[in-house]
């Protein structure tokens, strides 16, 4: 019998945080579930942890590297009615997934909850009850790990061409046919602890606003041009208004 929920966990050389992520799952969900760990590390450093926690394991090092490709492999391997994704440095809150699943029995679409953002000095709970399609068309508000959706409702994979925000693009792609439903309460804790960045990662972050433009081009919303311009200004980018009037040609 297939499980109720599939949980896809991409990982890369972070065994301590992967341990924390996998250990959180048992307290987050009591329904039947499977965990799929997709490892980008050539040494397969996540294998022992995946085995210890009873997870399915796939090592994909050297082929289609990156989060998008890992999540897509997880989608292909998943058997659950519902699916969610968890980054290896984040972890689920107790009963968080159970609350989403309980609500999902009566709703069709993307069911999401709130999240906590934390670092070594502080933690803040983020209420997402205000999130709707318009909010999502400006910037992603729902982090990976905070939502579940029906696996059969997935019509497109994560875009491996994007430098960043592939999770935002994935959600926008599916919101039209999978309405958003909010469930109060923290579902996932997002680790914002600063890490040492390589020059490549730093460059990707500096260019992340270009992915905003790519995504906005796919999802034109002229009534939100002002909000989108304001977001770019907050990133230190000022563009002529006409450059935000997109035709979807991607």
Locate the predicted segments by residue.
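Active-site beta-to-alpha loop of glycosyltransferases that engages the nucleotide-sugar donor
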Residues: 9-20, 41
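Short, acidic, metal-binding catalytic loop of nucleotide-sugar glycosyltransferases
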Residues: 23-32
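Short aromatic/hydrophobic "clamp" motif used to bind/position activated sugar donors
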Residues: 83
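Acidic donor-diphosphate engagement hotspot in glycosyltransferases and nucleotidyltransferases
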Residues: 17, 46, 71, 92-99, ...
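Conserved donor NDP-sugar-binding/catalytic core segment of glycosyltransferases
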Residues: 97-125
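A conserved acidic beta->alpha catalytic loop
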Residues: 37-48, 87
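Conserved nucleotide-sugar donor-binding catalytic segment
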Residues: 130-212
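Glycine-rich, basic loop-to-helix element that forms the pyrophosphate-binding segment
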Residues: 61-78
């Amino acid at each position: 019998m297939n499980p109720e929920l599939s949980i896809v966990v991409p990982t890369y050389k972070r065994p301590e945080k992967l341990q924390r992520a996998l250990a959180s799952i048992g307290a987050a969900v009591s329904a039947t579930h499977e965990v799929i760990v997709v490892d980008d590390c050539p040494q397969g450093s996540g294998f022992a942890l995946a085995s210890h926690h009873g997870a399915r394991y796939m090592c994909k090092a050297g082929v289609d590297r990156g989060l998008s490709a890992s999540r897509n492999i997880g989608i292909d391997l998943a058997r659950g009615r519902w699916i969610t994704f968890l980054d290896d440095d984040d972890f689920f809150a107790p009963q968080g997934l159970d609350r989403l699943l309980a609500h999902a029995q009566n709703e069709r679409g993307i069911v999401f909850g709130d999240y906590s953002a934390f670092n070594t000095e502080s933690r803040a709970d983020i209420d997402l009850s205000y999130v709707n399609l318009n909010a999502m068309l400006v910037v992603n508000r729902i982090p990976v790990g905070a939502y579940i959706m029906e696996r059969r409702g997935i019509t497109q994979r994560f875009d491996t061409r994007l430098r960043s925000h592939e999770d935002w693009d994935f959600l926008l792609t599916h919101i039209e046919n999978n309405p958003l439903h909010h469930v109060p309460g923290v579902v996932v804790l997002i680790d914002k602890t600063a890490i040492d960045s390589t020059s490549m990662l730093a460059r990707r972050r500096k260019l992340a606003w270009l992915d905003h433009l790519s995504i906005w081009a796919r999802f034109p919303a002229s009534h939100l041009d002002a909000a989108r311009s304001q977001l770019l200004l907050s990133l230190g980018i000022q563009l002529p208004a006409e450059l935000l009037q997109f035709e979807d040609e991607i």
